[in-house]
Amino acid sequence: MWNGKKKAVTFSYDDGVTQDRRLVEMMNTYGVKGTFNLNSGMQSYANVWEHPKGLLIHRMNTEGLKELYQGHEIAAHCLTHADLPKYDEETICNEILEDKKNLEERFGQPVVGMAYPFGTYNDTVVDIARACGIRYSRTVERTGNFGLPEEPLTLNPTCHHNDADVMDLIDRFLASDSEEPQLFYLWGHSYEFDVDQNWDRMEEILKKLSGHDEIFYGTNREVLFGE
């Protein structure tokens, strides 16, 4: 399925925050690829908020992001990180379409994916996303397994990088000899590594998952659609 391989690994990180710089450098070092979900209406260093643990979280300025994320995929995360089910259909459509359009203009690549802000969605949101040209959208509901999604517009990840069993899941994935395609899908926010002071955790994850000849390393779009 993936250049003849039966296993694939992909990553998904949200919000376009300053910590993405370190994360991208690490991912590039280990030869893995991911998808970064951005809010084009909020992409500014001046857009800052305070985490409950006291850390100030900054988004990055737009300048230089095309070069930073080169080799990875850019996906929508809605114009203003809106909690979509709380809004009317026109607002939902605008949040998705405007973000998609802005990102395509800034990065020069088609935007076919999305991550639901706050992980919230309903049938109306899914239908509007599909009508807006979104082909897949990630939730925050972990599966704890490696099957491919039946409905890409409600794409549930394998796990979050902070899940207690993430290393055990990686070991299970690596040991699996299933004849069915197996996908390890990890998600999170890069600022969490500063908040939790556990960049070493991501280093360990990348060391375990990378460098396997039998695994395809791709963006969300590549592992889902082969393109």
Regions found by a protein language model. Give the residues of each.
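Boundary/entry segment of secreted carbohydrate-active catalytic domains
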Residues: 1-19
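C-terminal domain-boundary segment and adjacent tail
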Residues: 1-2, 29-31, 40, 104, ...
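Hydrophobic "anchor" residues on beta-strands that sit immediately upstream
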Residues: 10-11, 73, 215
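Glycan-processing catalytic domains of CAZymes
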Residues: 11-12, 76, 136-138, 147-171, ...
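Active-site metal-binding loops of divalent metal-dependent hydrolases
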Residues: 13-16, 78, 190, 220
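Short beta->alpha connector loops
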Residues: 15-18, 117-121, 161-162
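A short acidic, amphipathic alpha-helical/loop segment
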Residues: 22-26, 124-128, 201, 205
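Metal-dependent polysaccharide deacetylase catalytic core of the NodB/CE4 family, i.e.
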Residues: 28-125, 130-135, 142-155, 182-193
